Amino acid sequence: MKQLLEVIDSAKSLIDENEKYIIFNDGKAIDTNALDEVEITLNEAIDFSDYLRKNDTDLEKLIDQNAKVKTLVSIKKDVDLKIIHVCDDAKYINYQIDIAKRLNVNLTVVYGYVVNDAKIKLDVLIHHKSVVNFREYHEFSGEAKINTSFYLLRFNQLNYLSLENNSNTNDLTLNMYLLQQDISLSCLNVAINESGKIQNQNLNVYHLHEDTASNFNTYAIANNNSILNIKNIGRINNGCPRCDLKQKTKGIIVDTYSNIEADPALIIDENDVMASHGASIGAIDPEVLYYLMSRGLTKEASEKLIIEAYISPYFKDYSETNLGKYILDKIK
């Protein structure tokens, strides 16, 4: 118990002044100061088949069958909210976030204290005319498999940012379902693999209605004999004209023995659309490195400066927050 309390105190150090929070331990909410803005219920769930009929993956089925508890977090008012996960025992975590209509929400989800092998499923439903800034930070020390799905309704605006800094094998799946018209989606994903192991990312955007727009950018870094596999799929269904889909992947391979594999794909079944994708993977530009070293920096310091600039979009207007400072200290 003493050790758990120490971890919770450490987790609370990531919370800024006047920020609302929920702390989860092994998938259960154990502490919050957001009861005016948020309702937390156990073993009640949104039926997402009311919004989209699809086949669940084997991982989703496994988590549904084995998670001891399912938690629903219902956001009812405008809020700046941080959700922090502490986990050292539960193997399966299953929860949902339901954001009501016409809200302005800044939401941060932190997996920074998950030390065991965990399989996690998060489903997020954003009702119409809401503006959501959603930030994630992953720091798994055990082997982790994460499936996160967003279901966006009409006139939504979602700005999604994530940073992966895991020290073990990791499989991440992110699904963005644009279900109704006039949805604007911006995604920034930063993946850092220095674990010496293989990490996989499957990043999917589905345009399932006309007049939707998405822009997905991934910045990847591999070092220390690590492998990072990134698969992007952007899909526009038939009958969904006037969609705009963009995706881009950039990668820096820091050492000789690491590798980044990027596999972008567009599946377009409609003519009246705009869609583009691209991938650029390679070592640090030697001319830039040489220039910095000629100014008196060591090779290591030069590489560090280049990488910090490379991932800086994640920290825009965020580097001075408690979590921003924590992450920057971790990746130095």
Feature map (PLM): residue ranges:
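Short, surface-exposed loop/turn segments at secondary-structure boundaries that line and modulate
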Residues: 307-315
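Conserved beta-strand/loop scaffold segments within soluble protein domains that form the structured core
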Residues: 49-290, 294-297, 313, 319-332
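Long, low-complexity, mixed-charge
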Residues: 1-70
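Extracellular glycan-modifying ectodomains
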Residues: 302
